[in-house]
Regions:
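Phosphate-binding loop of NTP-binding sites
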Residues: 4, 23-24, 59-63, 72-215, ...
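N-terminal leader/targeting and accessory segments in enzymes
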Residues: 1-93, 97, 275, 387
Length: 448
């Protein structure tokens, strides 16, 4: 019998993992990437005898596929995808494909902001509790690679809307929806489509599964009833009492998973390692998931108080001459920058800008007027930023490199200030990606 052909589009972390798993499961595998493939992935393909091409898409080969597994970074309207859809070849994502070959528990986490922090925190709790847990999706390793080579009992997955769009049969045993604010509107026809994409994390869930969500998020609250959700709901809120779920009472996080008054778990917000209102939400979500999994209270409490956040996410990098330098390069949308500013109660010099994804800066205006003493614009086209904040910030300066941004910001700063790289934009105009932007920022700070 002829082997089924699988074509994998995109040869990054997820593509390489999908290729290795498909090969292990007996498929005829071909990997195609329109860009250059990193050496580490070429080595993986060679070692596993997987055919690949780079810097091109050979349509003749691609259209012979029985199934295509595409990278989440490839939009559905890309020319290569249009031809695949025309030929009615089934298309999946790496997470969807990997989930067919494991019966392990899946904890899926999505939202416009806070996904990475909540995913890392949840994984930290599970690991410290002694559970064999993998970290995958948008952070950590490829799920498919782990399923193929290093299977775990639990997988904690950070899921972007693009990954959720490529899922049909995937089911989260625990689904977490943190918030929904306008983002990626360059990839979605409307905000409603993006909302539907986020809610699709509940697809295929049954009454035996859990859906943890933020009750205070207006978009989630308004759209809940329009989605047929079968899972047991566990809302969390800092504004009202939610049972079963999590809420705030006198600066104490109270988690109650039963329909009665006795709390399952309590902890003071002053003991959280992650401060700021958005991080109370992130901590609540992770703690509810851990409680559902019956992890011991002491372990959850320890993890919420000793967790260190990811690189590039409100990362306090250095203090030089009494000025704090904070790398929040992962803030690629306006809401992420709003959360960052909301965390500080000292004067901020804000490094802002990059590739604008249709940003509405008016959301930031009140916080910028209140907290920001100068803006350093790091991008090729900063007209929108100047227009948005010219009335409330005296000093707005344009720069074209991380070195220049840090030098300019430190020249404007005085002791006690915070220099915050929180760009609210994608990074592709001046940098490879947000990691490259964050690392260049830290190198420039080090050079001070």
């Amino acid at each position: 019998m002829e082997k089924k052909k699988i074509v994998i589009l995109g040869a990054g972390e997820s593509g390489a993992g999908a290729a290795v798993l498909a090969k292990a499961k007996g498929y005829d595998v071909f990997v195609s990437d329109s860009g250059a493939i990193k050496d580490k992935y070429k080595t993986i393909f060679s070692e596993n005898k997987i055919a690949y091409e780079e810097k091109q898409h050979t349509m003749e080969k691609i259209l012979q596929a029985d199934e295509v597994i595409k990278s989440p970074g490839i939009p559905s309207k890309a020319p290569v995808m249009k031809k695949i859809y025309e030929k009615k070849i089934p298309v999946s994502g790496e997470i969807e494909f990997a989930s067919r070959y494991t019966k392990s528990k899946m904890i899926g986490i999505t939202g416009t902001n806070g996904k990475t922090t909540t995913t890392l925190l949840t994984h930290h709790i599970l690991t410290k509790a002694g559970l064999k847990a993998g970290l995958a999706g948008n952070v950590g390793h490829s799920l498919a690679m782990m399923v193929a080579q290093d299977p775990r009992d639990y997988y904690v997955l950070e899921l972007s809307s693009f990954q959720l769009d490529d899922m049909k049969t995937f089911k989260a045993d625990i689904a977490i929806l943190l918030n929904i604010t306008p983002d990626h509107l360059d990839r979605y026809p409307s905000f409603e489509n993006y909302i539907d994409s986020k809610f699709s994390i509940t697809r295929n869930q049954t009454s035996a599964d859990a859906f943890i969500y933020c009750e205070d998020d207006l978009v989630i609250a308004e759209n809940l009833s329009q989605h047929n959700i079968s899972a047991q709901p566990y809302p969390f809120s800092i504004k009202k009492k939610t049972i079963p779920g999590a809420y705030l009472d006198n600066n104490e996080i109270i988690i109650n998973l039963k329909n009665h008054q006795n709390p399952t778990f309590t902890m003071s917000i002053h003991n959280l390692s992650l401060q700021g209102r958005h991080n109370i939400y992130n901590s609540m979500a992770a703690a509810v998931a851990a409680n559902i999994l019956n992890i011991r209270k002491e372990v959850i409490r320890d993890c919420l108080s000793d967790f260190r956040n990811a690189e590039h996410r409100l990362e306090h990098f250095a203090t030089v001459h009494g000025v704090d330098y904070v790398n929040d390069s992962k803030a690629t949308n306006v809401n992420s920058t709003w959360y960052a500013l909301e965390s500080y109660h000292r004067p901020v010099i804000l490094i802002l800008g990059g590739v604008d994804k249709g940003n509405d800066y008016s959301i930031l205006k009140d916080l910028v007027c209140e907290k920001v003493k100068a803006i350093v614009c790091l991008g090729k086209d900063n007209k929108k930023i100047h227009k948005a904040f010219k009335d409330c910030v005296k000093m707005i300066v344009d720069v074209s490199s991380a070195d220049e941004a840090v030098a300019t910001a430190s020249g404007l700063a005085t002791k006690g200030d915070v220099i915050l790289l929180s760009p609210a934009c994608a990074s592709f105009d001046l940098f490879e990606n947000y990691e490259d932007r964050g690392r260049q920022f830290k190198r420039a700070v080090k050079a001070l």
